[in-house]
Amino acid sequence: MSMGLEITGTALAVLGWLGTIVCCALPMWRVSAFIGSNIITSQNIWEGLWMNCVVQSTGQMQCKVYDSLLALPQDLQAARALIVVAILLAAFGLLVALVGAQCTNCVQDDTAKAKITIVAGVLFLLAALLTLVPVSWSANTIIRDFYNPVVPEAQKREMGAGLYVGWAAAALQLLGGALLCCSCPPREKKYTATKVVYSAPRSTGPGASLGTGYDRKDYV
């Protein structure tokens, strides 16, 4: 695997990791749906993993941290845990990638470096899946409630920017992890012993046919 490809994969994975952190912090997983009587409302409601915010038409915003975890919907409760685990897993994957990088001297053996890089790629892939699951789950819940006639219009929500950031972060980590997993260990060179046969030098003199150093005329 070339160093350029390794750096590209690591950079994409790091961008995805930073995107996951932004996705976790943004209070815009769910936003007010301006339908029906909500069209003329003077405020916009944002709901995130840790707080909800009310934005007035004047631009003033008030945010409040959730008082109880049990008051959250199931998808947001699961999203909290999965997103935090994804962030920690990607951070550990970054440390592993730095250890196995070709530009570092933490490990001298090239084969060991390649295996460590593959482990880092797998960690980034797992982090991407842990990010993708809660984001997609929340989006599915929002869409299902939006088209549910039983849910009042005031409680219907639309997908916020946090979900789109989460999808982009998961895609970057998937791509970066896949590139790191392409790091194949170098093949070991096998040397085969070659047999060398030594033969005595053959004499080309006149007495070579008799196997002695005398000339033929000495026997006449």
UniProtKB/Swiss-Prot annotation:
Transmembrane domains' residue ranges: 9-29, 81-101, 116-136, 160-180
Subcellular localization, as worded in the UniProt entry: Cell junction, Tight junction; Cell membrane
Keyword Cell membrane: yes
InterPro entries for this protein: Claudin (IPR006187), Claudin3 (IPR003549), Claudin_CS (IPR017974), PMP22/EMP/MP20/Claudin (IPR004031)
Extracellular topological segments: 30-80, 137-159
Task performed by this protein: Barrier-forming claudin. Plays a major role in tight junction-specific obliteration of the intercellular space, through calcium-independent cell-adhesion activity.
This protein's name: Claudin-3
Organism: Homo sapiens (Human)
Gene from which the chain derives: CLDN3
